Regions:
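Compositionally biased, intrinsically disordered or flexible polar/acidic segments
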Residues: 2-233
Length: 233
């Protein structure tokens, strides 16, 4: 019996079997969430994406981001207010939208105004990268709203690592506001804002918006990777 246990334990320790076990555990977690979670796969046309490089000068817009191949534009025409900050030390990050940011020293609430399609399901992604752009060594903490409703609290806890917030949302009108709300002494910032229209069958939900709960990358046993996204109402 002990020999069998030792053999089973040794098999689990192999990299391939550990990957299989990880995938099985992940599958069980997803099943356990039942109707409150789904795997999200965006099969939209990239031409329908909204990709804003926040703080990008209009003269440098648009551009094709080398790592993703997506076309980014300046956020200049989508928000009133805010100032442009440039990250001097990006911590080795190669993602181009992290090189600049927009920060909001004035006002309590600063909102992006975006044109969307009413009733369409969107994956909304907001990226925040501090990089000590102001030299003050003060990590920002503030709230993020969808219109008048609370989305999440953005608590940036690392200087040189991006903070990413994601949510699935169905706008009820053709206009969508994404607002940064100052809640303390630190200054709200944002590096990038991305919207992806999703297929209606990507996630079936009747309880409003769905905030990202977890993300996991698992091997597909062929050489690539599969991204699993778990969203919670």
């Amino acid at each position: 019996m002990n020999d069998r246990r030792n053999l089973f334990s040794s098999c689990l320790k192999t990299p391939q079997n550990m990957e299989i076990l990880q995938g099985l555990v992940l599958a069980l977690i997803i099943v356990a969430f039942g109707t409150t979670t789904r795997l999200v796969q965006a099969a939209s046309d990239p031409r329908e994406f909204i990709n804003l490089d926040c703080g990008l000068h209009p003269a440098a817009s648009p551009y094709t981001e080398p790592l993703t191949g997506l076309v980014f534009t300046s956020d200049e025409n989508f928000i009133q207010g805010g100032q442009i900050g440039r990250v001097i030390n990006d911590g080795g990050e190669a993602y181009k939208p992290l090189k600049v940011l927009r920060y909001f020293p004035d006002g309590i609430r600063n909102c992006y105004h975006l044109k969307v399609t009413s009733g369409t399901k969107y994956l909304i992604k907001a990226v925040f990268f501090y990089g000590n752009y102001d030299g003050l060594d003060v990590l920002p903490k503030f709230d993020l709203h969808l219109g008048p409703n609370m989305w999440t609290t953005v608590d940036i806890d690392m200087y040189f690592s991006p903070k990413i917030e994601e949510i699935i949302h169905i706008p009820k009108s053709s206009s969508l506001q994404i607002c940064l709300v100052k809640t303390g002494k630190s200054t709200p910032i944002i590096s990038a804002l991305e919207l992806r229209p999703l297929r209606d069958d990507t996630y079936v939900n009747t309880n409003g918006s769905l905030k990202l709960l977890a993300r996991n990358y698992a091997s597909d046993f062929i050489g690539g990777s599969i991204r699993y996204f778990i969203y919670l109402a």
